[in-house]
């Protein structure tokens, strides 16, 4: 009977005997993400945004005051295929998707208006029962960010929202702070990892000296296979 021998080695010893010298590293973006990265590298921003929407990437449109976030949002939504079912959640009707017949617009109470106190978080939770293909949220402002992220991550890819921030990095930070407001009892690093795993694209808008609105930056997080 052959007795199995088990060596007691550490990783440094493995390295010393050359165990890692011929290792092949396979960390590849999936084909769709590779195409999107190629579009970005080529400076084809309009085509990148179009293909990202069609590929159902989760998108945040970020910008400061008066940078045209809602206008750009509506322009981007024209790319969404007309056969999809879209639910919008807003505190004022601004999202326009007339080319999509199967749509439902939900509106929250703003500033205590109306007899029923319906928050944005209430709308997000309600819309999940309406079985949307995508969820379009007018603007993320507070703890409803976690409900939005959870909805996006549980069967509603391709969802889009806007957020008030001056850079993609600050947009990520804003999302983290908003989710922390929900009091989930998880660490900041855990929230950061979650946000980075859910949000694929951040489109940053700026307002130029002559009032021209433009896309100043694009953040793109590739998924690996």
Regions found by a protein language model. Name each.
Residues 1-3, 12-16, 118-120, 174-176, ...:
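Surface-exposed beta-strand edges and their flanking turn/coil or helix-capping segments
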Residues 1-54:
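P-loop NTP-binding catalytic core
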Residues 2-4, 106-109, 221:
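Generic beta-structure capping elements
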Residues 5-7, 94, 111-112, 224:
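Active-site/binding-pocket entry motifs
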Residues 9-10, 97, 171, 211-214:
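Short active-site-adjacent structural elements
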Residues 38-42, 46-66, 71, 75-198, ...:
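Switch/coupling sub-region of P-loop NTPases
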Residues 193-225:
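Conserved P-loop NTPase
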């Amino acid at each position: 009977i052959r007795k199995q021998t088990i060596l007691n080695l550490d990783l440094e010893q493995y390295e010393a005997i050359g165990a890692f010298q011929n290792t092949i590293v396979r960390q590849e973006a999936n084909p769709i993400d590779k195409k999107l990265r190629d579009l970005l590298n080529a400076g084809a921003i309009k085509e990148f945004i179009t293909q990202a929407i069609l590929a159902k990437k989760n998108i945040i449109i970020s910008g400061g005051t008066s940078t045209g976030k809602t206008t750009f949002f509506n322009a981007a939504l024209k790319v969404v295929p007309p056969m999809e079912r879209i639910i919008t959640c807003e505190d004022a009707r601004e999202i326009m998707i007339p080319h999509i017949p199967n749509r439902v617009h939900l509106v929250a109470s703003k500033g205590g208006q109306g007899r029923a106190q319906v928050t944005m978080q209430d709308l997000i939770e309600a819309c999940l029962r309406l079985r949307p293909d995508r969820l379009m949220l007018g603007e993320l402002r507070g703890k409803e960010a976690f409900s939005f992220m959870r909805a996006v991550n549980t069967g509603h890819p391709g969802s889009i929202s806007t957020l008030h921030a001056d850079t993609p990095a600050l947009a990520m930070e804003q999302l983290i702070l908003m989710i922390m407001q929900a009091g989930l009892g998880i660490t900041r690093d855990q929230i950061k990892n979650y946000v980075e795993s859910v949000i694929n694209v951040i489109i940053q808008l700026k307002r130029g000296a002559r009032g021209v609105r433009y896309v100043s930056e694009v953040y793109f997080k590739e998924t690996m296979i």
